[in-house]
């Protein structure tokens, strides 16, 4: 880091000549005009890469490929229209989400829409080896799902927590009232007292409807309970913002990494969010690797760069004319 702070003037003062070297390479973060250095030393002077780990590529070597095989965040991929699909249709969508990186398939129930084949859907997915969660406002649906073998139930409050004691499924806890952390804390402490495993979700709100405050709530939740499992539903940002989901997922997973959040509930409904689950999979791996290396999340993958390349190759005017012709 000290070398990166050197200026051309400092280098000129400290390094009187280049000795036997036929080229001088200064740090990539060295700012200023380096042409006078070439005049002083009589050899070419170049600016190297900004990041130490880019040196192999700078010298023409392939370098070590980042290891993105590990991650810590589970992805729950929600099938939001599950009641409207056949069991075969649910299985097909589950297989597609699994291929994109989903760890758990979430069956989203619709208010007022019967889900007569809920039990069959859960059992079909379990028979194929899927981990399954069911998301419903109806305690009847949640009980049916739990008895059918669902692994997780979304979402229970302190008022409906009794459901969790009727089945083996792990409950995902949310506030009984919007934004009410005390009610979430009470549900958490009830599960802890009963020895019941759980996941807590403080609820991420959309932009202009409480986003910033909801992030603060997640921070407060993690500070109060350093060791519990926490989930964040990211669809309120990826689905409800007209912006490329690559950047949204990247930023969210940076926050998720800093807060040690253990799971996300992701959706892929809007046309612009068609790859949101696959992007979430890559983002969790990049952030995990960068955190393990104690580095900024740069140089691990280009897969989250949708509009610009990290090292763009620009064509000259003549080359563009030649291509156009």
Predicted regions: what is each one?
Residues 166-308:
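Catalytic alpha/beta core domains of metabolic enzymes, predominantly
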Residues 71-92, 176-180, 237-246:
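Active-site mouth loops of central-metabolism enzymes
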Residues 42, 73-75, 112-144, 166-172, ...:
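Alpha-helix-loop-beta-strand connector modules within alpha/beta enzyme cores
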Residues 45-50, 105-111, 129-138, 149-163, ...:
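Catalytic beta/alpha-barrel core
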Residues 85-97, 138, 142, 184, ...:
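Short, acidic/polar
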Residues 1-32, 45, 132:
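Metallocofactor- and cofactor-centric catalytic cores in central/energy metabolism, strongly enriched
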Residues 22, 43, 71-75, 102-103, ...:
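Short, well-ordered coil/turn segments that N-cap beta-strands
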Residues 6, 29-37, 56-57, 111-123, ...:
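Active-site-adjacent beta->alpha loops and helix N-cap segments on the catalytic face
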